[in-house]
Amino acid sequence: MRSLRQDLVAFAVITAVIAGTMLSAHPIPIARPAAAVSIHVPVVEERVSSAAPDLGSLDEDIGSVIVISWRGDINSGVRSLLDDGRVGGVLLFASNFSGPAGLASLTDRLRALTTSACLDHPILVMLDEEGGQVTRVQAGFAPPAQLVAGSGGADHVRALERASAAGLHELGVGLNLAPVADVRTNSGDQVILDRSFGANPAIVSPLVGAAVQGLHDGGVGATLKHFPGLGGSAGDPHVAIPTDYESEAQWQRTQVPAFQAGIAAGADAVMTTALYVPGLGGGTTPAMFSAPVVARLRTQLGFGGVIVTDSLSMGGVGARYSLPEAAVAAIAAGNDMVLLGNGDPGYEAEAMAAVRAAVVSGRLDRVALHQSAMRVNQLRDRWGRRFVHCRALKAT
């Protein structure tokens, strides 16, 4: 187990680097942290088997594609799910811990639980740490993307993201739900704001790619969001599902390039969101529940990694779907991993039961679910962390 003192020292150094770098309002030389983190990341095999899986592994596959959240500290329900290996990941919020010391302690305990359970794949610890207004560790952990974009170019962004990721890595985070790849083309936008690198795809795209590289440099996985792009809409899906009225040609020109750049840089995951996109053939189905829209990530952008939903507990989603219905609809649309995003007791079991029933009834394709689970497990093997590998434990 790593030393908490080491975690906090590393965090202090990293936040000091970020703060010092951002003091100037003008482009400045890249600050290279003196104690840069050098981490070997194994290459992940993107291909998954198309062979018919054993139906006996259905519950394991369902668990792999589920990400849970909860309120407060680890409770008995969460402990039971982790002990049984029934979830692929956990998404932590500021309500789960207090500052960097609390986060380090929490991730240590989570990994201790999953190590003792001897899972075949480590738990994936996830966090929304974009910087600016969307921060979980503590205020000021990292600057907002818009400010970063205005203070330097791609090398500058990469250095800042490397420093931020090194801090997250030391605090036990495996996958960051960042960077934001949305290009803010709608002046009436209410949700992206300074979370985006800007309104010009020619400027935003290389910065998104640099952010992905910086996160990897620091030892953390990267997630592009919010596909197919919230920057062209004016509403907030946490309240009501917004609409992007861009045509296919406009979308190709404004929103696609940044996602392409992030994918080319090696993004591990892409987050889909609740957004009506009639110009893309989504009709009256929100993008992350629309198979034709989600499929564009595979067929048009050539993405072979994990497709993960935005929170299924957002207000806009809840007005249309129950949580179990949303989980099934999201998987049916081609998402590999679902963020349940709800702290109510028992919600995980309801969602898992609904997915299982959908597989048994034939609504969900069994082989497709297995392939999704394999992609997720590859992601867990790459960015999940544990103290002792289960194969070593089983050999003793």
Per-region residue spans from a language model:
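Active-site-adjacent helix-turn-beta-strand microarchitecture at beta-sheet edges
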Residues: 150-155, 164, 192-193
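Hydrophobic faces of well-ordered beta-strands that scaffold small-molecule active sites
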Residues: 64-70, 88-92, 123-129, 175-179, ...
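A charged helix-plus-loop insertion that forms the helical arch/lid used to bind
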Residues: 141-153, 198
